[in-house]
């Protein structure tokens, strides 16, 4: 009876202050969020966030500065407009904006809810200096499509990231949601979805794609995979892409073996029209889904291969960092993040697996695998090869480290290749990077983080003293990796060979380019290896074509010349007029048979049986 009397008295007191909401304090109350995707005003969506009761006079509300998996400062608060806070009577409270992502609400004890409008990122990517990477961005296209990366729509109150969220989304009845969030409204109401998240991280970890229903589902070793496709011009259907995804993900599960994984996985594929649309192509991983953005204009063969390469990388993130990760990720601070030292693992291991599984499962040939690894070596040269990978990782949001982020996919892969070969060599083929991640996953899993500074020591204790030397020199330290040392263990080596090319391109790689800022002038590309035809005739990087065999060169006139060149006889005399440093030059020479020098990974001449055996277990498992 005393408790009842106490709550009655407190209720009367709160009502006298104008309160009409539950007296549950904010830290014990579910946060209720409403998104209105029907009444879209000027390409903006209205969001309301309704917490429990506060006692503090000052309340802080945040929209994320950055989110896990992006490793960049994106300031999603810049896309928030008309932010307001209301008391229990509906009157506005005083609000000040502290920075791009923080709002300070005074008289917090009277706070009922906040509301604001969200602008999307896709159609403004070309207008801003540092655009949000499209797979982590947002799209608002009234009645047609909504890409809800929820960190761009839903914010959080200081100290309340661990309380549950209920998301009520009013949407056009003709659009269907694809997401891994669980619905709570057992009795469906047309045009209304209600989702539950156990904490704020779960909100940000579960994007939602609203589009006209185009979903293909399939089962892979106990996982239900849903492929949802938004193709604005109807060029692609989920059903047409399903088979390749099934084959790829089946191979991934076979490669992973008994690693614990999700029961459901959603692939949200957004195909961009390019103009005033998403232009950052790739994907962003989540525990049970991934957002993929690719151009709709790609032909199906290239689109499917891009999906294989991108989605396989994202799916492998279920191993790391979604399972094996540090405290910095488990307790991620969305507005003052402390970054982990181990991007060599989170992104490097994942990208390595995304290539290794394809050779192990027979999706690509050995030659294709070597070409991919060689490509990583060449691409890694664009970055600082003496930069400590762990120092770069923990400072990845800052200069000069952030400009080297792309190297996590290049040298990060190569670090894992060298580590993998070393483990195979020291264990007579028994241990590998995959074995290592499985062991770490058994110990930690998604609920138990490791201590950032202890990981390398733990890996050494699980393996061999030589692994400590490797990390000290090549991951923590600044010593570049001698890749030949590791390739030689499996009977391979780096070398240069001559390969036949076309006169103007090798495969899909052209030796020429177009300067759109200079009337589409056609010029010789710089800083690439030119073929023997270009070299022999005297062409140099930066030369601007004026004519070929008397034909004035424009982008339009060059296309048929390239087509005709495939039939040129070797003794044909070719005359090319170019502009070089303001001077017109006439260059003449025979067509010949064009070849280009190519860096390759190739088999050594005197390979031992032991090296072949180690190569077999490395590449075939």
Predicted features by range, described:
Residues 49, 214-342:
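Juxtacatalytic substrate-recognition/specificity segment
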């Amino acid at each position: 009876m005393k408790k009842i009397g106490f709550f009655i008295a407190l209720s009367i007191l709160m009502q006298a202050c104008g309160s009409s909401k539950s007296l549950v304090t904010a830290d014990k109350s579910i946060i209720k969020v409403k998104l209105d995707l029907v009444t879209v005003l000027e390409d903006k969506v209205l969001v309301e966030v309704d917490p429990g009761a506060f006692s503090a006079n000052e309340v802080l509300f945040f929209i994320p500065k950055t989110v896990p998996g992006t490793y960049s400062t994106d300031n999603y608060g810049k896309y928030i407009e008309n932010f307001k806070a209301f008391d229990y009577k509906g009157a506005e409270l005083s609000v000040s904006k502290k920075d791009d992502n923080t709002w300070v609400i005074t008289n917090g004890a009277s706070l009922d809810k906040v509301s604001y409008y969200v602008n999307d990122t896709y159609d403004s990517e070309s207008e801003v200096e540092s655009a949000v990477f499209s797979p982590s961005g947002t799209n608002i296209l009234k009645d047609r499509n909504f890409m809800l990366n929820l960190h761009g729509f839903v914010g959080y109150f200081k100290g309340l990231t661990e309380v549950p969220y209920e998301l009520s989304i009013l949407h056009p009845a003709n659009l269907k949601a694809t997401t891994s969030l669980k619905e709570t409204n057992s009795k469906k109401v047309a045009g209304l979805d209600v989702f539950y998240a156990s904490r704020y991280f779960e909100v940000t970890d579960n994007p939602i794609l609203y589009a006209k229903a185009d979903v293909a589902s399939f089962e892979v070793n106990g996982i239900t995979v849903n492929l949802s496709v938004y193709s604005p011009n109807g060029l692609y259907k989920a059903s047409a892409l399903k088979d390749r995804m099934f084959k790829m993900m089946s191979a991934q599960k076979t490669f992973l073996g008994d690693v614990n994984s999700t029961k459901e996985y959603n692939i949200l594929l957004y195909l961009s029209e390019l103009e005033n649309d998403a232009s950052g192509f790739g994907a962003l991983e989540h525990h049970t889904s991934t957002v993929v953005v690719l151009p709709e204009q790609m032909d199906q063969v290239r689109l499917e291969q891009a999906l294989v390469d991108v989605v396989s990388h994202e799916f492998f993130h279920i191993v790391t960092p979604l399972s094996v990760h540090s405290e910095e990720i488990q307790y991620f601070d969305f507005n003052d993040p402390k970054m982990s030292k181990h991007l060599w693992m989170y992104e490097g291991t994942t990208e390595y697996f995304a290539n290794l599984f394809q050779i192990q499962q027979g999706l690509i040939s050995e030659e294709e695998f070597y070409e991919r690894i060689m490509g990583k070596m060449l691409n890694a040269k664009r970055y600082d090869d003496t930069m400590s990978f762990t120092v770069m990782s923990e400072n990845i949001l800052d200069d000069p480290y952030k400009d080297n982020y792309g190297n996590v996919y290049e040298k990060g892969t190569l670090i894992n290749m060298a580590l993998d070969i070393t483990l195979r060599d020291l264990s007579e083929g028994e241990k590998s990077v995959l074995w290592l991640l499985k062991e770490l996953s058994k110990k930690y899993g998604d609920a138990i983080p490791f201590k950032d500074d202890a990981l390398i020591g733990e890996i050494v204790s699980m393996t061999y003293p030589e692994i400590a030397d490797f990390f000290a020199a090549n991951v923590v330290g600044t010593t570049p990796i001698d890749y030949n040392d590791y390739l030689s263990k499996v009977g391979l080596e780096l070398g240069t060979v001559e390969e036949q090319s076309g006169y103007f391109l090798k495969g899909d790689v052209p030796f020429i380019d177009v300067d759109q800022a200079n009337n589409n002038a056609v010029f010789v590309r710089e800083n690439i290896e030119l073929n023997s035809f270009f070299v022999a005739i005297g062409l140099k990087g930066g030369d601007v074509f004026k004519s070929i065999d008397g034909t004035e060169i424009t982008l339009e006139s060059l296309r048929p010349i390239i087509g005709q060149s495939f039939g040129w006889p070797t003794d044909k005399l070719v005359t090319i007029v170019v502009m070089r440093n303001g001077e017109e030059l006439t260059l003449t020479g025979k067509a010949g048979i064009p070849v280009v020098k190519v860096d390759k990974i190739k088999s050594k001449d005197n390979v031992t049986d032991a090296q072949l055996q180690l190569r077999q277990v490395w590449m075939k498992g």
